[in-house]
């Protein structure tokens, strides 16, 4: 892609998200979401591969439907209440419809079906943008509209996303689909606590972005898209395979890695709110996600020669990619747990 075109598209991504962040009017927030969608569509379709074009078409149709629903709901709310304020959704019908539209935007269960299929058709870097940056603007709107939304709906969305994200990832062999279901499960953890402690949602979102960035960038360096290609990574690059293993375990939420921090804080908050059943269900759904991360770790570290492998080994060539983003994201993914008290002080 032409570097000038790429610069314009990336600037538009930043502009759309910033516009949604800073707006208190539904029309401006909607415009920011649409700028985001229109900016990422050319990035998704740049490969000119049938799978990429199919994924782009699916993404565009789903996002257009969600945007139409947001515009319709905000207009209906303005007609009923006489205000366009983002935080002013007094009616249960409009607030529920808006929550489902935003859930469709970010791929929360049960509106999640498009996300694995779209992510599977993209290359890893575009998939990284879709899994991280594109979640920011809708999540900002969800945080602002939470106070007027029925708590039962938020709890149901959170449990369903965590459960489906863990359960559906168990039988996957494609790494991008596994990361898509991982994204759905992490979004469930954010939604479950958003009504009680929005600052914990922000912490969970931040750690998720760093962990997912580390996972995508590591797989990009390893040129891995399926589980059976991970089996040759240890002989090819032992250090990178060890780093990738720790990143996956961090995504699974094992201590003493960063991924344990949001799960620990969220379970603690749910227990404080006298919701032991919800906390227990969320802790059990985390085990489902942990299982398929352990599958990836097993493929990378324990399935080495002379064992039988089902994929041809790759030549080990010197990478020309910039390793700074990978280094930063891996460092944050592994070492943020001791800073938990400081992070809590900064966000509360």
UniProtKB/Swiss-Prot annotation:
The keyword Mitochondrion applies. The chain crosses the membrane at residues 1-21, 25-45, 60-80, 99-119, 124-144, 151-171, 178-197, 202-224, 239-259, 274-294, 326-346. GO terms for cellular component: mitochondrial inner membrane; respiratory chain complex I. It comes from the Eukaryota. It is found in: Mitochondrion inner membrane. Its EC number is 7.1.1.2. One of its GO terms (molecular function) is NADH dehydrogenase (ubiquinone) activity. InterPro entries: Complex_I_Subunit_2, NADH_DH_su2_C, NADH_UbQ_OxRdtase_chain2, ND/Mrp_TM. One of its GO terms (biological process) is mitochondrial electron transport, NADH to ubiquinone. Core subunit of respiratory chain NADH dehydrogenase (Complex I) which is composed of 45 different subunits. Belongs to the complex I subunit 2 family. This is NADH-ubiquinone oxidoreductase chain 2. It comes from Danio rerio (Zebrafish). The lineage of its organism: Eukaryota, Metazoa, Chordata, Craniata, Vertebrata.
């Amino acid at each position: 892609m032409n570097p000038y075109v790429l610069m314009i598209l990336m600037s538009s991504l930043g502009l759309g998200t910033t516009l949604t962040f800073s707006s208190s009017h539904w029309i401006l927030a909607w415009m920011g979401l649409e700028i985001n969608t229109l900016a990422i569509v050319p990035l998704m379709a740049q490969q000119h591969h049938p799978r990429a074009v199919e994924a782009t078409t699916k993404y565009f149709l789903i996002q257009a439907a969600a945007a139409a629903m947001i515009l319709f709901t905000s207009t209906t709310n303005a007609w009923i209440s006489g205000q366009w304020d983002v935080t002013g959704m007094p009616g249960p019908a409009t607030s529920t419809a808006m929550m489902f539209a935003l859930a469709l935007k970010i791929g929360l269960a049960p509106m999640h079906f498009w996300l694995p299929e779209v992510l599977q058709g993209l290359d890893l870097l575009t998939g990284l943008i879709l899994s991280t940056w594109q979640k920011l603007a809708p999540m900002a709107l969800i945080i602002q509209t939470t106070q007027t939304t029925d708590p039962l709906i938020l709890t149901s969305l959170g449990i369903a996303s965590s459960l489906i994200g863990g359960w559906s990832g168990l039988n996957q062999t494609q790494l991008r689909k596994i990361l898509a279901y991982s994204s759905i499960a992490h979004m469930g953890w954010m939604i479950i606590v958003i009504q009680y402690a929005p600052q914990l949602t922000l912490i969970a979102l931040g750690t998720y972005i760093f962990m997912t960035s580390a996972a995508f960038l590591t797989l990009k360096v390893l040129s891995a898209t399926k589980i059976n290609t991970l089996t040759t990574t240890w002989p090819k690059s032992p250090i990178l395979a060890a780093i990738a293993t720790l990143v996956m375990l961090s995504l699974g939420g094992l201590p003493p890695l960063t991924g344990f921090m949001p799960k620990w804080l969220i379970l603690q908050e749910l227990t404080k709110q006298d919701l032991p059943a919800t906390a227990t269900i969320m802790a059990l759904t985390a085990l489902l996600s942990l299982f398929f991360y352990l599958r990836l770790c097993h493929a990378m570290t324990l399935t080495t020669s002379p064992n039988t492998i089902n994929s041809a080994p790759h030549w080990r060539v010197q990478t020309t990619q910039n390793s700074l983003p990978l280094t930063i994201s891996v460092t944050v993914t592994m070492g943020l747990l001791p800073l938990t008290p400081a992070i809590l002080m900064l966000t509360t």
